[in-house]
Amino acid sequence: MAEYGKDYEVIVVGAGHAGCEAALASARMGCNTLLLNLHLDAVAQMSCNPAIGGLAKGHLVREIDALGGEMARVIDATGIQFRTLNTKKGPAVRATRAQADRRAYQFHMKQVVENQPALDLKQGSVSRLILQGDKVSGVETTDGLRFFGQTVVLTTGTFMRGLIHVGLQHFPGGRAGEPPSLGLSDHLAELGLRVGRLKTGTPARLDGNTIDYDRLVPQHGDVPPKPFSADTEKITSPQVPCFITATNAHTHDIIRQGLDRSPLYQGVIEGVGPRYCPSIEDKIMRFPDKDSHHVFLEPEGLGTREVYPNGVSTSLPPDVQLAFLRTIPGLEHVEIMRPGYAIEYDFVDPIQLKPSLETKKIRNLFLAGQINGTSGYEEAAAQGLMAGINAVHALRDCPPVVLGRDQAYIGVMIDDLVTCGTSEPYRMFTSRAEYRLLLREDNADQRLTPLGHQVGLVSDERWQRFTRKMDKIVEGRDFLEKRRLSSSDKEAIGRLGLEDLKNGLSLVQILRRPDINIEDLVFCDDRLADIPENVREQLQIEIKYEGYIARQYEMVERFRRSEQIAIPSDMDYSPIEGLSIEVREKLQKVRPQNLGQAARIPGVTPAAVAILSVLLRRN
């Protein structure tokens, strides 16, 4: 083994979405950082769909941005369609989704990484960790190099013992055309970490020149497109439509006939697949009464003919893929440019992590992304950002940054992982959050930018813009409370459909009415037009939903009280009377840090929590 002549403070293994955020956070916080990837042409690669955001995922992207992460800025620079989803529903579940130019996104993120001071990007495959006692001190690569670092972040994606399946053929790979990472997961298991097996998949890529777009329904983006990042003034990339079609009974018949050559249905694949992003084979078999499934045709970029058919992920043989695709309207003469495939890979049971994403067994070793059992670029990037921040805090002996369930979707996700673990690829949903009315996209900066500035990831310039926005919210609320309409404002009363106002009403009182929005009030007083649109939107939400918001804050206060009751890390649960054997085993396995976390462990009953509460308060 040859030692590399330079020591690092933070080493990040894997330059996908988690690894890029972890390495950038570490370097921007002033630490000498190394980012290693199997292949430098695959930095920030979008392995599956060419899109960022979506339901709950858009919230994660806004939170990453509010903390000072990079993903939002890169998609704003390279996005080719932006849409707000759930516009007819409440503000808690509205979300932004952007189609990406896949190559442009990858190239842009790599440029950001390469231009970041204190960050070295190198090619290499890590096979082992270097340990000093119970503490990590570096990594070894398959080509015989040893890199030393005070903290290590593993963000290996789907590469650990990756195995690709196309029909009944299978071969090692971490992604199509790229080798897997061999040796590392076996090494982690040797060190005592529990390693499991998961599966995911991707559809074929289609030749756009062989698609009959006249038979498809176009789906256009918002005009004007709304950026993800607070740093982006406006989207400047050309915008393009997606197209919608659907499978039919003939499609489903061909798929059923091909199941004897499906690795999924012939017992070849052992890993558990994603429940909420099933393959088209799974959809047909799990929902036999459904005679059609939507297919969204998404362009892979402005400079390519490749099209991503969202909704038909598959590992069937290429000839079956082509046959079923050609039964779909608009795809009768389609050609496949790359076949779809399934991939199995190793992951580490996230119950073995602290809320900081540091492993409980090995000090200064952090895990983020799909290695923790999650799926999705956004989930990975969010974990990478937090792991990067906490890796720096660990080597500086600072307390870890742990976001609460009431503070961020990132906090909900990490708490779910380290408290409950996962046996299938974990995906973020708004329904996973108890306090989702407090965790909206529009107030992500309000919730997290102060923390981002505190840890050193939000610039002073951006902090000043944020404080100016907060001042405008206060001023806007004050104006709406003081400005009143009276019976003399006959034109305004008539246009708003109000009855004669004897005692007058403030604009806040009027805005609380369900049929009136803040734009309706602009003609009442043109000073409202001077308030920025994003501030007006936030004022409207906070005023219209303030009763519900107040109730959620009351719930949060009760929740926080239980979170403040700490549980010693070395607590022995075996002698505690009243706890069942099952509860003791679960508490011993998870080792919750506080009473609130203990209460969220599946199988830990309210009675058991009450016993723990009495014991902890007594001691």
Swiss-Prot record:
Major localization class: cytoplasm
Residues the entry annotates as binding FAD: 14-19, 126, 181, 370
Keyword hit for Flavoprotein: yes
Pfam families: GIDA, GIDA_C_1st, SAM_GIDA_C
InterPro entries on file: FAD/NAD-bd_sf (IPR036188), GIDA_C_N (IPR049312), MnmG (IPR004416), MnmG-rel (IPR002218), MnmG-rel_CS (IPR020595), MnmG_C (IPR026904), MnmG_C_subdom (IPR047001), MnmG_C_subdom_sf (IPR044920)
Keywords (A to Z) from UniProt: Cytoplasm, FAD, Flavoprotein, NAD, tRNA processing
PROSITE patterns: GIDA_1, GIDA_2
The keyword Zinc-finger is assigned to this record: no
Residues that bind NAD(+): 273-287
Gene3D superfamilies: FAD/NAD(P)-binding domain, GidA associated domain, C-terminal subdomain, tRNA uridine 5-carboxymethylaminomethyl modification enzyme MnmG/GidA
GO terms of molecular function: flavin adenine dinucleotide binding
Compartmental location: Cytoplasm
GO biological process: tRNA methylation; tRNA wobble uridine modification
Source organism superkingdom: Bacteria
Necessary cofactors: FAD
Any one cellular-component term (Gene Ontology): cytosol
SUPFAM superfamilies (alphabetical): FAD/NAD(P)-binding domain
HAMAP family given in the database record: MnmG_GidA
Function: NAD-binding protein involved in the addition of a carboxymethylaminomethyl (cmnm) group at the wobble position (U34) of certain tRNAs, forming tRNA-cmnm(5)s(2)U34.
Assembly information from the UniProt record: Homodimer. Heterotetramer of two MnmE and two MnmG subunits.
Family statement drawn from the similarity comment of this UniProt entry: Belongs to the MnmG family.
NCBIfam families linked: mnmG_gidA
Name of protein: tRNA uridine 5-carboxymethylaminomethyl modification enzyme MnmG
Organism of provenance: Syntrophotalea carbinolica (strain DSM 2380 / NBRC 103641 / GraBd1) (Pelobacter carbinolicus)
Name of the encoding gene: mnmG
